[in-house]
Amino acid sequence: MVFAIPDGICYCFVAFVESSLSQHKNLGKNMATQKIIYTAVDEAPALATYSFLPLLQAYTKRAGIVFETKDISLAGRILANFPENLAESQRIPDYLSELGQLVRLPETNIIKLPNISASIPQLKGAIKELQGKGYAIPDYPEEPKTDTERELQARFAKVLGSAVNPVLREGNSDRRAAASVKRFGRKNPHKLMKPWPSDSKSQVAHMTDGDFYGSEKSVTVNNACNVRFEFVADNGPITILKEKTGLQAGEVIDAAVMNVRALRSFYADQIERAKNDEVLLSLHLKATMMKVSDPVMFGHCVSVFYQDVFTKHAEVMKELGVNVNNGLSELYTKIGNLPDAKRAEIEADIQTVYKTRCELAMVDSSKGITNLHLPNNVIIDASMPVVIRDGGRMWGPDDRLHDTIAMIPDRSYATIYQTVIEDCRNHGTFDPATMGSVANVGLMAQKAEEYGSHDKTFMAPGNGMIRIVDDTGKILLAQPVKKGDIFRSCQTKDAPIQDWVKLAVNRARATGAPAIFWLDEKRAHDKEIIAKVKRYLANHDTNGLDIRIMPPVEAIRFSLARIRRGEDTISVTGNVLRDYLTDLFPILELGTSAKMLSIVPLMNGGGLFETGAGGSAPKHVQQFLMEGHLRWDSLGEFCALVPSFEHVSRTFHNEKAQVFATTLDEAIGTFLENQKSPSRKVHELDTRGSHFYLALYWAESLAAQSRDPELQACFVPVAHALRENEAKIIGELNGAQGQPMDIGGYFRPDRKKTARAMRPSATFNNIVDGM
């Protein structure tokens, strides 16, 4: 069987000889169904796949396991959404929709690598690249004026932000550091921690009124129904914002509003405060996942900070169609076509702002790229842990670390970061060699909470009321709004809550650690969830378990105290805190969140195994393109494969799959012990070399085991060949570095060029492919 591979996708051939199936009839169910789906994604993990997937396919063929790829990259999703614009040979299936169906099947087994959660600038960049490759994809209409353009914008919205995860996450999340990773982290603590001065001026700033937290209303519906979202203007007319949304019996639905006048006032106050305190100003949002609300909040900050520029040049900005939601970068791009004198005038006015305002935190000080250049450059779940790790500081225009006011406008989750800052100021930095762990059980199934709110988030078209009305005409929730206010509604279904509670009890039982539900009874949504948690906990045997419900600030104080004593805790949280905490604690503990084990037990019995939480690492790609060195650490992929193989073993009674799981886990331990993760420096071990060492240690473990003599006999010569040629292979891999790489594209690289770049060792390739 050969899987067809569309050109330009990070795919590798899956060749599986049908006749070999007859040799393994004792493995249980039909071999053709013993499939692991390996997602084809973007940027650094996509490049790493070219090196690692052929190895997986070669090693596991004898277990009757087929690795099949599904393209969920940004470029792939764009192409799948516009088949009518493409020639037959250019079309690809809508793999994301396929996966959305597969996650409901009990045998489904998916390795999910990080993909781009696209901002509008990234979307436009991908479209431009595809157009340059001959794909007739239309331009993205930022300000649609016709029905056709509005329809086009809605189609592109399907690939913006975190379009992938809500589709795949048909289960709740179990995230923790693998035991081997934790042992290694304590024995070899990372050295990224910087001291916390007791006189640090750094702090989190949040709104005190007018935010989502303060306005939130929530209700649980008793019976299944349909609701509509409508805007009732002060002068009477009613506009339907969303015609129909289905609610299940027992579902929780919320409505909250961000008052943009209060938001802008908050920004202005913090700008002055940062200047007076002589600290950096930084903004921390999630414009990728919260793809409707947060870019608008980001844009308001841009327009307030650069208010003098936008006021003075208002007519020019309007003519150019500058959208502040895309950041200062778009302004620079669009003024590039102005006459030199006018462009220079605007650029000079921007520099004047920097002289009169507070200093901004920088993304790249050498290039003058600030926190406000692009909405996706500073993402809260990744940025705030680094602020804390770096002693409460961020990089300034002088390329040095400085204290910062970290603006997180909404109170719902901002307070947890301020609590960590206070803890560090009082007790000093954390010690990775002794600190405990905080695992997470996260409520995320079926688009739970804020991360499923995109299609129910609206900018108020005027002054009036936005309300949620059921099909009998009953008003469930209503929120007063002013023009431009951000209205957001979230749904949380009952079955995922029941599953979440069960998973929390199971993890508490398995570990003996306290399990803390982070829920705030003063918050409308959490009050509804608390009632359900108490009800469903009563369905489980909790004798001997320490299970508590605490507001987030109390919960994080409790967890931090245990961390400093070297004790482990389970955080049981909603969807957003799941995202934030599974970056925060691993970055402090291990130096990165990419080393986390992330298991999603799908609600119908399948398994989704996510490979870390560190994003798709565009800076790694930049280094690879410049000097042929890729520093992506595939440890997340390695760790995810262990429970994936175990799932195959359980589902199909495949003993060989369990052998692969056991030996891979042993190999990961050896890999960590020998410190074979990629270096950051060119001509040293990179991603490809780390894959070689995983292959070597895994082959040696398979050769040493006696549980499966057939696999042992197969891997004895492989292990010998890899060990015998170690120096030669590493020489070939490292020797390929040190020069610019041409892979024929960024968002959709050329498959053949990338395969050559990522598999430069003929010796290694011959051993693997010869299997």
Q: Which role fits each region the language model picked out?
A:
Residues 712-720:
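Short, charged, amphipathic alpha-helical segments
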Residues 730-746:
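A glycine-biased, small/acidic residue-tolerant capping/turn segment at secondary-structure junctions
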Residues 10-12:
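Cysteine-centered motifs
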Residues 32-299, 308-532, 536, 540-558, ...:
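Extended, well-ordered protein cores
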Residues 749-771:
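C-terminal accessory extensions/subdomains outside the catalytic/core fold
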Residues 19, 24:
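Cationic, low-complexity basic patches in intrinsically disordered or flexible, solvent-exposed regions
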